[in-house]
Amino acid sequence: MDKNKHILIGICGGIASYKSVYIVSSLVKLGYKVKVIMTQNATKFITPLTLETISKNKIITNLWDLDHNEVEHIKIAKWAHLILVIPATYNTISKIASGIADDALTTIISASTAPTYFAIAMNNIMYSNPILKENIKKLKTYNYKFIEPDKGFLACSSNALGRLKNEDKIIKIILNEFNQKDYLKNKKILITASRTEELIDPIRYFSNTSTGKMGFCLAQEAVKLGAQVTIITGPTNENDPEGVNIIKIKTAMEMYKEALKIYNKFEIIIGAAAVADFKPKHIFNSKIKKNKINRLYIKLVKNPDIIQHIGHNKLKNQIVIGFCAENSKNLIQKAKEKLKKKNLDFIIANELKYFGSKLNKVYIINKQSIKELPEMEKSEVAKEILKILY
């Protein structure tokens, strides 16, 4: 644990503000250097003197507390190795998402490149507001991180989603951020992701419901661990992960050709794409008119199996990981068969029902063992999968 890290705590105005005292106190006791910014509304719930005593630093409550001769807001933004906003309110989240910097907290966040966490706490109706959801989604694309609230009793007397996550869990999340190591430093990883689209005519195609989220989570987490990542992706609505070289394709053949051109340059290949098994043998030159056809027969031909080709042609020190999606009844058996048939080092087995979901439940399988993971967010699944590489 690196005790030389600096943590900036931003406290917003909400009934959960008082819980920040425990978090600041705990981080100081652990040896971290902690500074606190409070919004004006936060000072209505808890006194700055309390936080000043605990943090052993002057509390900033507005821009005029800063020494402008030193461009202090920039100095503090650079000082922070991590920013935690707690409780993150509807107002503050929305201001940051809109690029508004009208107080000390929003100004410093706007000038910082440090990992920034928003620990959300608010009324359940406010939390479900679509405007807030869009703002959170927007901020996530810029790598802001969110500690989602729990269900519990709220200030409005409702028992609903919106209660600040347990303080010890928040502290654990912060410590995990600092404890990340470059376990995959300079490792070259190739990942295939999302679905492919096989044209029937100029506007219609065969495809599936894969979103690419699992592959993109793997790419993002691998970058955090120091890897050099290239992702070959089919169509997706996922945001491009930062620090990743991205190759975009549409069809299975395009993915196959791109993968074969470069896979021997990588130490690790992960086939997370849901590649179409078949494609139309012929593509209609123009849109098919239903008024001219009573029955339509389309002859299909097999697409090449990308990960199988790589598995059987891998270099001596390459690790090849595949994915297998099946119904739960035959999942493990089918995965074992594919592991052997495709000459893979590992295969990740998951049920079909998780296609298009933010969650996943997988089994990590190799020749010697089967590791079952509980249902969890795909970003967490990605972390667990990557652990097999170090």
From Swiss-Prot:
Catalytic activity, reaction form: N-[(R)-4-phosphopantothenoyl]-L-cysteine + H(+) = (R)-4'-phosphopantetheine + CO2; (R)-4'-phosphopantothenate + L-cysteine + CTP = N-[(R)-4-phosphopantothenoyl]-L-cysteine + CMP + diphosphate + H(+)
Cofactor-binding details, from the entry: Binds 1 FMN per subunit.
Binding, CTP: 277, 287, 304-307, 323, 338, 342
Catalytic center residues: 156 (proton donor)
GO molecular function: FMN binding; metal ion binding; phosphopantothenate--cysteine ligase activity; phosphopantothenoylcysteine decarboxylase activity
A Pfam entry, by short name: Flavoprotein
Spans annotated as Phosphopantothenoylcysteine decarboxylase: 1-188
Keywords: Decarboxylase, Flavoprotein, FMN, Ligase, Lyase, Magnesium, Metal-binding, Multifunctional enzyme
The UniProt record lists the keyword tRNA processing: no
The protein's Enzyme Commission number: 4.1.1.36, 6.3.2.5
Phosphopantothenate--cysteine ligase: region residues: 189-390
Biological pathway: Cofactor biosynthesis; coenzyme A biosynthesis; CoA from (R)-pantothenate: step 2/5; Cofactor biosynthesis; coenzyme A biosynthesis; CoA from (R)-pantothenate: step 3/5
GO cellular component assignments: phosphopantothenoylcysteine decarboxylase complex
Function: Catalyzes two sequential steps in the biosynthesis of coenzyme A. In the first step cysteine is conjugated to 4'-phosphopantothenate to form 4-phosphopantothenoylcysteine. In the second step the latter compound is decarboxylated to form 4'-phosphopantotheine.
PANTHER family associated with the record: HOMO-OLIGOMERIC FLAVIN CONTAINING CYS DECARBOXYLASE FAMILY, PHOSPHOPANTOTHENOYLCYSTEINE DECARBOXYLASE
Similarity-based family: In the N-terminal section; belongs to the HFCD (homo-oligomeric flavin containing Cys decarboxylase) superfamily. In the C-terminal section; belongs to the PPC synthetase family.
Official protein name in the record: Coenzyme A biosynthesis bifunctional protein CoaBC
